[in-house]
């Protein structure tokens, strides 16, 4: 979307409106299609895609914005007449006028299934999620109907912009001086209430970046686990596009400068299983399969060595690293707030193939870490097939691995689950739905 806005030379209010129309329509698409179906003699899937997309934009303006109804209908009909044709514009006009007779709150009881008879279907239509995703999130969050509704509603909120100040290169104080606000959890985070993040000098100079708080905390948790002996060789096995690698690289070089947890010297055992702050002096190897993503990692990091390699079949010797990060490819169901189109593009049939890849990457990471070293397995998805099932399967197969309680290395955050894994949630923490498992090689 940002690239398209630049191409069309839209900025300021026009860019904001275009972004809201596009992302807002994508978030509400499932609900809007049910309403369109109720106002038409044709099912949405039978309507030509360009015409249907224009009507969806009009419905979003009618039901979720302050655009006057006559303006929403008129501009949409004009767009259809210009891009599709006169006949299609008459159809769009008829549908939108019917939609405009009720508010969203009035439409929902009409188009959504009865919650007593079909709670999953009711939530899917009311909160505009595919049914399979609602089922998967229900299984993962383990909450009641009200909590599920809160989670799905949070997926439809615009995410706040969170910045990360990379230690040794920037500071939270610098970000605050640039107009950001204090963050809740990560000691390196600040919230940007408005404006373009690229206009922040530290971001423009790659000393800071946009990074969700949960993503930052996953990195911090890995660096806080006490490791006996040497602690100078770190690996990011799936480093592209570089968000976690950028923070890992900075902490590896400069250490955890926040002072929120006890500091240990590099290679010194803290004598405790609790979180301790790394003091610096490590080297990061950032591995990425795709060349263009490896280039992004190279641009993001300062001191890391970046290699293009298949993480499931690495060239290095087993046991070469003290700490390993596995930010595994996943469905991204934890980031639906910032990628509203993903809920409609993802297919549950991809889960078996993804699961095999995730298991292969975690196995490779555990082979790559030395005995006594630690592996962080993270996904931006709470789907149990990508999280607990993957880690549990590996733990059953291998007797040289133990799961640590990831929550104990994140003392800033409550509500991360029953352990030993940590699960962030949009409705509880205001972050992406990031999952973390910490595993020590025996």
Predicted regions located by residue number:
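S-adenosylmethionine
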Residues: 1-442
């Amino acid at each position: 979307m940002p690239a398209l806005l630049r191409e069309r030379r839209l900025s300021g209010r026009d860019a904001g409106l275009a972004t809201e129309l596009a992302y807002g329509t994508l978030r509400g698409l499932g609900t809007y299609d049910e309403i369109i179906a109720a106002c038409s003699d044709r099912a949405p899937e039978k309507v030509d895609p360009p015409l249907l997309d224009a009507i969806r934009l009009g419905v979003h303006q009618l039901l979720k914005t302050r655009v006057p109804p006559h303006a929403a209908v008129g501009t949409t009909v004009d767009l259809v007449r210009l891009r599709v044709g006169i006949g299609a514009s008459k159809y769009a006009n008829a549908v939108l006028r019917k939609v405009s007779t009720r508010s969203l709150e009035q439409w929902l009881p009409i188009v959504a299934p009865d919650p007593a008879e079909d709670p999953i279907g009711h939530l899917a239509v009311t909160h505009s999620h595919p049914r399979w995703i609602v089922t998967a999130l229900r299984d993962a969050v383990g909450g009641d109907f009200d909590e599920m509704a809160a989670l799905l509603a949070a997926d439809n909120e615009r995410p706040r912009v969170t910045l990360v100040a990379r230690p040794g290169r920037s500071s939270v104080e610098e970000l605050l001086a640039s107009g950001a606000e204090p963050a809740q959890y990560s000691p390196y985070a600040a919230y940007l209430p408005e404006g373009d993040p690229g206009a922040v000098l530290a971001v423009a100079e790659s000393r800071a970046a946009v990074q969700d708080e949960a993503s930052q905390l996953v990195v911090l948790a890995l660096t806080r686990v006490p490791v006996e002996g040497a602690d100078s060789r770190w690996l990011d096995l799936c480093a592209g596009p570089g968000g976690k690698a950028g923070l890992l690289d900075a902490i590896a070089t400069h250490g955890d400068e926040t002072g929120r947890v006890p500091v240990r010297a590099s290679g010194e055992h803290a004598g405790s299983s609790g979180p301790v702050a790394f003091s610096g002096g490590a080297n990061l190897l950032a591995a990425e399969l795709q060349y263009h993503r490896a280039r992004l990692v190279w641009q993001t990091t300062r001191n890391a060595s970046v290699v293009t390699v298949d993480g499931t079949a690495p060239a290095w010797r087993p046991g070469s690293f003290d700490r390993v990060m596995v930010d595994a490819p996943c469905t991204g169901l934890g980031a639906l707030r910032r990628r509203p189109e993903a809920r409609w593009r993802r297919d549950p049939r991809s889960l078996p193939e993804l699961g095999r890849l995730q298991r292969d990457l975690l196995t490779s990471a555990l082979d790559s870490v030395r005995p006594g070293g630690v592996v962080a397995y993270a996904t931006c998805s709470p789907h149990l097939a990508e999280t607990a099932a993957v880690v549990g399967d590996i733990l059953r197969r291998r007797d040289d691995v133990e799961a640590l309680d990831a929550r104990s290395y994140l003392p800033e955050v409550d509500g991360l689950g029953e352990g030993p894994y940590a699960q962030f949630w949009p409705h509880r923490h205001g972050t992406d739905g990031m999952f973390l498992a910490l595993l020590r090689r025996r």
